[in-house]
């Protein structure tokens, strides 16, 4: 068993640098078994529309995530997943790399990514692509506004094929951005937030 599979620190990393990636329980592939006609019928009965409001945010204090579509939600797909990410003003996420590609559609805010040491600016309406194996990190460049993005990954397909290596280079920050200790990611992108700003 590798150190990552056991939850221990990978070679060359201390115990404090290991995030919860290797410890978090996931559904990688749902069982597909039975008569073809029955499986096909069940597929047609699965939901086609999902509300992000039905899923709670996880993470923090600088980066929050909610998994909207993935194999574990019985969404009728096992090839990709999508989640909503929110970054606190001035916040950032972990620096990491994975074998699957990923697409980030910026819904709100502005910031930048570092991909293999190169700086890439982004803003609402942009699409950012991370290629397989790229060491990357996301940053919210605004000190006053949160950043929100829709992330689409082919991770379930890669995991099914055994291409599941992921490495955290720098873990998620554990301290909140000063002044944003009580940040509520559920208010981002909602009418209540816009109303509060207009007061």
For each predicted feature, which ranges?
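Short acidic-glycine-tyrosine-enriched beta hairpin
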Residues: 117-133
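A generic "binding-loop/recognition-motif" signal
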Residues: 99, 118, 134-135, 155
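A short, N-terminal "cap"/entry segment at the start of jelly-roll beta-barrel domains
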Residues: 2-78, 165-199
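A short hydrophobic beta-strand segment most commonly corresponding to one strand
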Residues: 82, 103-105, 128-130, 144-163
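Glycine- and acidic-residue-biased ligand/ion/polar-headgroup-sensing regions
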Residues: 88-89, 100-111, 117
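Conserved short histidine dyad/triad with adjacent acidic residue
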Residues: 65-70, 81-97
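Short beta-strand His + acidic residue motifs that chelate non-heme Fe in jelly-roll/DSBH
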Residues: 93-96, 113-114, 130, 136-143, ...
């Amino acid at each position: 068993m590798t150190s990552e599979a056991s939850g221990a620190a990978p070679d060359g990393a201390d115990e404090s640098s290991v995030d919860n990636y290797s410890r978090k329980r996931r559904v990688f592939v749902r069982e597909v078994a039975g008569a073809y006609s029955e499986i096909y019928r069940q597929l047609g009965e699965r939901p086609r529309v999902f509300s992000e409001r039905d899923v709670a945010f996880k993470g923090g204090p600088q980066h929050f995530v909610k998994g909207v579509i993935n194999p574990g939600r019985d969404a009728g797909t096992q090839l990709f997943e999508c989640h909503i990410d929110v970054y606190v003003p001035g916040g950032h996420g972990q620096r990491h790399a994975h074998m699957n590609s990923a697409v980030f559609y910026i819904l709100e805010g502005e910031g930048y990514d570092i991909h293999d040491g190169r700086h890439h600016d982004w803003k609402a309406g942009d699409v950012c692509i991370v290629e397989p194996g790229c060491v990357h990190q996301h940053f919210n460049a605004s000190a006053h506004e949160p950043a929100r993005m829709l992330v689409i990954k082919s991770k379930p397909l890669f995991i099914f094929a055994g291409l599941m290596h992921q490495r955290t280079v720098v873990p998620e920050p554990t301290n909140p951005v000063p002044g944003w200790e009580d940040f509520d990611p559920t208010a981002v992108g909602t009418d209540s937030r816009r109303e509060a700003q207009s007061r």
